Amino acid sequence: MGAQLSTLSRVVLSPVWFVYSLFMKLFQRSSPAITLENPDIKYPLRLIDKEIISHDTRRFRFALPSPQHILGLPIGQHIYLSTRIDGNLVIRPYTPVSSDDDKGFVDLVVKVYFKDTHPKFPAGGKMSQYLENMNIGDTIEFRGPNGLLVYQGKGKFAIRADKKSNPVVRTVKSVGMIAGGTGITPMLQVIRAVLKDPNDHTVCYLLFANQSEKDILLRPELEELRNEHSSRFKLWYTVDKAPDAWDYSQGFVNEEMIRDHLPPPGEETLILMCGPPPMIQFACLPNLERVGHPKERCFTF
């Protein structure tokens, strides 16, 4: 009798075990390995490619631990690069332009601040020049995820007031974005996440400020997204020095630009900002307030 029960249990359990094993294999396949497992640990990643985008802008590609790894960075978060330069520890935040749809690598687009270019900063940018001088095969330490905002999809933003606060989830229909220079990278991250989901009906409005037309980072990528998703992504530029044939705005971000090219204030509108602190403090915040956007619906990366 015991032998019969044992045989019966194997007959009953075998299909169950088969289904369980199949489920586990599928689950494992659908969950790629994550590089940034612990935000307190530094992960050395190897430079595998360097692309010249413009006279002072580069795209750096770093290999993840395996071709099956993803970075593991939530939308809206950033990483820190750290290294020693002239004996001193230098740490800088960056937002990748690649996403977790990309396996095996992470891309950073960086504007290189060369020495003896700007009279106020004769030494140039320490980290950007370090990256510029890296050789293929060299490594640098990544740490993350970091940041106070996460885009959860379908208009939902989880925002914390500080690192110790619990996130508050805001659901919106429109996102107004003001970016200055390299501040475009977190905006592009959010825009791509919205547009890749056909069921996400959030509309993104980007006002992108630069010194000149040649300084506009990632312009081909932005305009391709606008052309493919014209009803869901609105794009406008302003530059300090405009060429003769220029179809966009000229000058610092002002009240008129915000009224004309960002969504109106409302319960279903969120404003995101990223750029030089003087731009945020003196151009963005005062003019957003004049237009009627409340501070609690404005977030600065």
UniProtKB/Swiss-Prot annotation:
GO MF annotations in UniProt: ADP binding; AMP binding; cytochrome-b5 reductase activity, acting on NAD(P)H; FAD binding; flavin adenine dinucleotide binding; NAD binding
Pfam families membership: FAD_binding_6, NAD_binding_1
Consequence recorded when altering K111 to E/Q: 2-3 fold decrease in Km for 2 Fe(III)-[cytochrome b5]
Modified residues (N6-acetyllysine): K42, K50, K120
Lipidation sites (N-myristoyl glycine): G2
PANTHER family: NADH-CYTOCHROME B5 REDUCTASE (PTHR19370), NADH-CYTOCHROME B5 REDUCTASE 3 (PTHR19370:SF121)
Name of this chain's protein: NADH-cytochrome b5 reductase 3
Organism whose genome encodes this protein: Rattus norvegicus (Rat)
Gene (UniProt): Cyb5r3
